[in-house]
Each structure stands twice: as C-alpha cells, then as structure tokens.
Amino acid sequence: MNSRDPFPDEELRRRIMDFIMAAGQTLLENGAEVFRVEQTMEIMARSFHLREFHVYVLTNGIFASAGTAEISEVRNVPVRTTHLGRVAAVNELSRQIAQTGMTLDEAESRLVLARRIPFPKDWVQLVSGMCGAFCFALIFGGTLRSALAAALAGFLASGYLLLCEQHELPGGFCKISCAALITLVCILACRMLGTPASHSIIGSLMILTPGIAFTMGIRDFVHGDYLSGTIRMIDALLIAASIAIGTGLVLSLYTFFTGVVVA
C-alpha cells in the first residue's frame, strides 16, 4: 500500500489522519502557536493527499475532519509545557514530508523520535534558574550581594518547581507558593548580607513571569485567533496574579510580625 497514493483508501486515510493529529498534538502541547499547528497539519494533509481536510485548533484542543466529514477526530490537549526542541523537530518533519517522498511509515517513526526528545536535565534547569535570577537582579539595579541572594532564591525556586511538576500539583498553587518561597528567601538572605531585598525579589520573580503565554497570546491575536489569544492572555494574567498573591502575602506577614517594611 503506497502512502503517497493520490487516492488513498479508507484505511490509509484514517492512518494519515491519526498521524496528522498526533503531530498537531505534539506541537500544541509543547508550546507552538495555534496558527503554526494548523498550518503544519494542513501541509501534512496535502502532502499525503488527504483531501477536504479541515482543522480548527484551540489552545487546549484540536478538531479535524477529512473527506466529506467521513473521517473526523477531536483531541483534548489539557497539558501545555514548553519544549521548543520538539516543536522544531515536528516542523522540520513537515518540511521533509512536503519536499521529499517520505513514506507514512518513516514519518510515523520520525514523529515518535520527536516526541521522545528529553527535557533538559534537572541540574541544567537549576543552574539556569540561578543564573537567570542573578542576571535579572543586576539588570534591575541590584548590587552584587543582591544578585547573590537572588541566585540562591532562583536555585531553590527552580528545585521547588521541579518537585511540583513531579508530584503533579496544581499550577496556581505552585506559582503562589513558589513566589512566597522566593520572597522569603530573598528577605532572609538580604538581611544576612546587609543589602535591600527589593532588587533580589524582583530579579528572582522574573523566572516565574508568564512571558511565553503573554507573547503567544499577542501572536494569536495578530493572526486573528481571538479565542485562543484570549485564553492565553487569561492564563498569563492568572499566573501574574498568583505571583502577586504569593509575594504580597509574605511581605505583609513579615511587616506584621517584625514591624519592618521590606525595602
């Protein structure tokens, strides 16, 4: 059975549909933009001669049909992480499918490999959080001692987020508690080092800010995907609110019990 047959039979069409849906799901759950997911799926459908293919993508779901709606499929994508390596691998796969005579069997094998690309090791994420917090503290006008306090907070916060991910804790709780942890560590560390804590707190909190969600929301708006853009913007606002709640709670309690306003 030739997967590049201009007129694939029903069994092959269903296989092609399953492959395209799996590719779209891989893109969406790893941080790709909605318009890019739709575009990539349409390219794959044309390349494999899946006629009358229509797809509608939201931030947490994919709806697609082929033929005269004789084949239709819906996939829920509740989990959204960020792994641009997987996104790049699937995009490259779609280009090769369009430009070469890659068979469906080979494409399915390549997609499995793309979905198995591992996340960075835990120690890389810990060091990245520490370095990011250190640099942001300096960027926002902090001293070297403030940056060192921020680095400690960034290291601990990255470790805490990894634990939350392993135990599958709710995202809102993780963000609130992590922001509270960062604020507390920065206050205590800066008090020991004799330096103001504000720059340390701001620099450390930057590793929690929803930059990707906010940027993706704007891009979705620009491409006319208003519903997906609204969902992403709400997601970004909820994360920002969680950070504010966690930080404000610790600052308020510290001032209440010590009578000292954090500067």
Describe the role of every protein-language-model region.
Residues 1-16, 117, 244-263:
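N-terminal charge/polar-biased segments
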Residues 1-102:
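Soluble N-terminal domains of membrane-associated systems
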Residues 35, 106-120, 172-173, 198-203:
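Cytosolic regulatory modules rich in charged/polar residues
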Residues 79-146, 235-244:
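Alpha-helical transmembrane segments and their cytosolic membrane-interface
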Residues 110-114, 157-168, 213-228:
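C-terminal ends of transmembrane helices
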Residues 119-198:
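Core alpha-helical transmembrane segments of integral membrane proteins
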Residues 191-263:
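Generic detector of multi-pass transmembrane helix bundles and their immediately adjacent loops
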